[in-house]
Amino acid sequence: MTSRDLRAVLTAILLGTAATGAAALVLAAPAQAATVSAKVGPLLKEAQALIAAKNYKAAMAKLNEAEAVKSTPDDTAIINQFKGAIAISSADPNTPGGAKAKFAQDYNAGKFKDVIADAEYLRKNNVFDAQSQLIVAQAYFKAGDHAGCVRYTKTIPQSDTALELQARCAYEANDEATQRQAYEALVARSGKPEYWKGLLKLGERSRGLSDHNTLDINRLRLLTGSMGGKDDYIALAQFAIQFTFAAEAQAVLEKGVAAKVLTDDRSLRLLARAKQDAAANLANEAKNLAAANAAPQGDDLIKIGENMIGEGKAKDAIGVIQNGLKKPLKDPNNGQIRLGQAYLAAGQKAEAQAAFNKVKTPEKDAMVAHLWSLAARR
């Protein structure tokens, strides 16, 4: 019996099992025109028949007999390959190949709790790789153990796939803190719009948000490329108009029109209104700025600076907002966030992060400032 013949036998055996890729695992060595000895050949044929009958114990006994009479390196190689085939076919978890086979069979059979338990066999056989760890995490999810999934995904390498699963399990487990942490990690790693969508949706659900906080979250959707469609453009524009930031609303609506998202009459009427209001604001800007400079408090300067950001004059806005911060403010946090927003719009990311990071309380303002800071790291 040649090595090539034996490889064909082994392939047939392995393809009859549920161990995906098992043939490739065992038959990695190249075929060659070698033969096994006369005493070993018949024993291997008997072992083949026993394996086909799934009598693995008897097949192993035959291989042990062959082991006792082997006389060539080819004998040893083929016997070892047969043993590997038995380990995989029988899903013997005490061998590397068998542990992998049992793991795959249990997952394919939907035995997700067994998959979780199989991880210990993979560890013992030193074959518990990153892909297997992700499969265990998926098994926790499919078994409905979402809290267990959260705990487990925190112990494995934090790949994008692991973090995505962690966020999903955290959502199912009502663990908003972990969900936020997972999305923040994903945003920091790649900044993909889908990750920003998840993170900003969480931010939007936070309690006690002011309209200004909500405006900022909508601004961040536009900035991070995570706008969902027409409603997001309209919402951002309407909030901007509410705060008299008409130039910003105009820019947002024009982007929606350019993207062919805003084509209806209502959107076009809103754009016309924004253009009209923006022109009026610009005409009065010098007068309003002089009055704000003369005022004892700095809130009007902060607002004018915020409007200037929307007009595309971020560098000018920085100085105006800084002057506002030198005076008493009703809302110091807003002033600090606006300074960071102006720096970011001007391309000064380090200064923007420093400004955002000064906002510590209350939680709603600190959360929004933190989101801005994450955007400044892009």
Task: Annotate each language-model stretch with its function.
Residues 50, 87, 106, 140, ...:
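Residue at a conserved register position within TPR or TPR-like alpha-solenoid repeats
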Residues 265-307:
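Flexible internal linker/loop segments at domain or repeat junctions
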